[in-house]
Regions:
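Catalytic phosphate/metal-binding cores of nucleic-acid and nucleotide-processing enzymes, i.e., regions
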Residues: 1-132
Length: 132
């Protein structure tokens, strides 16, 4: 299954299981673009090619009364290794994505990698607390 097919499955799950939850999926992230299209997309995204694939715009209270403003998910297809045996990120691109996720967490969002549909579903269900 491609990353773009995974995004579609996760979006379908959200629409079915949590119909009132607002979310945005970056459909273009898994699609091969021409050099011109890629350049235009990069300019439109502020030069940030490591932006997460999905955002769930549902704030929630955490322990100690802190608000988490929403959930960003960087989706990876099944079988993707995020790290090497040494603990380093597997690729430069994954390292860039991890940096963006860290920066989003610092700003009050939950931000995680999810490898495969089951991991994404579990992350979403845990974040939304089973509300539908």
């Amino acid at each position: 299954m491609s990353e773009s097919e995974l995004q579609t499955m996760v979006a379908d799950y959200l629409r079915f299981q949590y119909p009132d939850v607002m979310f945005h999926s970056d459909f273009g992230s898994g699609i091969k673009l021409t050099p011109g299209q890629a350049s235009k997309q990069k300019r439109q995204n502020g030069g940030k090619r490591a932006w997460p694939d999905m955002f769930i715009a549902e704030p929630k209270m955490q322990i100690q009364h802190a608000i988490v403003y929403g959930l960003f998910i960087e989706l990876k297809k099944d079988g993707t290794r995020l790290t090497k045996r040494t603990g380093e990120w597997a690729t430069e691109h994954i390292a860039e994505q991890a940096d963006v996720l860290d920066r989003l967490r610092f700003r009050g969002y939950e931000a995680q990698f999810a490898v495969g549909f089951d991991e994404a579903k579990n992350l979403i269900d845990k974040y939304l607390g089973g509300k539908s």
